[in-house]
Curated annotation (Swiss-Prot):
Compartments reported by the entry: Plastid, Chloroplast
InterPro entries: PRibTrfase_dom, PRTase-like
Predominant location category: plastid
Record's keyword terms, sorted: Chloroplast, Plastid
Coiled coil segments of this chain: none
Family: Belongs to the UPRTase family.
GO cellular component, one term: chloroplast
Record-given protein name: Uracil phosphoribosyltransferase homolog
Species of provenance: Pyropia yezoensis (Susabi-nori)
Pfam families reported in the protein's UniProt record: UPRTase (PF14681)
Amino acid sequence: MQLQINIASHPLIQHWSGILKNDNNPGTILRTACSELGKWITYEIMREWLVTETIELKANTTISLISSHYKYIIVIIMPYGFILAEGARSLLPTANIVLVNYNDIINNVPDQLNSFTKILVLDLFLDEATITPLLNDFIKKGAVLSNIKIACLECGTSQLNQLGQIWSKLEIYTTKVNTNVDKEKCSREDDFKDKFFV
């Protein structure tokens, strides 16, 4: 495994991660925690990822704005990735949204991507079986792997090992790498689904 794994350490990420670990919290609080984590993990990604350009105004004044030459796409792995997206979209309000239900693309990715396309994939728990087909589709359409970032709350080492064998340069942002997750079921979605949708 040679993936670039980034364990987000922002104080607010640590706070909301702590809230999420308390299963005694009601679903509304857990959902809020996920939304906030989606926002702050996205913030950590954007710090090094966004491309800005300098605009000259009158009176020798310049301002820095997000470059209009780049196109941003947020890929939401349904149904739980949507909870992360609630926070992430506030930071990238002009990004195109693509909804993915497991391996079936609901709202298709544009047919042509290029080096000016930046893609953020959001999922609650990393699932190699979903990510690999998506990456294959993105690369086939012209995307550059270095412009693709994965954001999730948790990922298992077995999933990371599988991804690392194919996508050694892939960059993943998460709050936790779980070494105890079962290889056949590396998701804890069942632990949350009844609480999120009440």
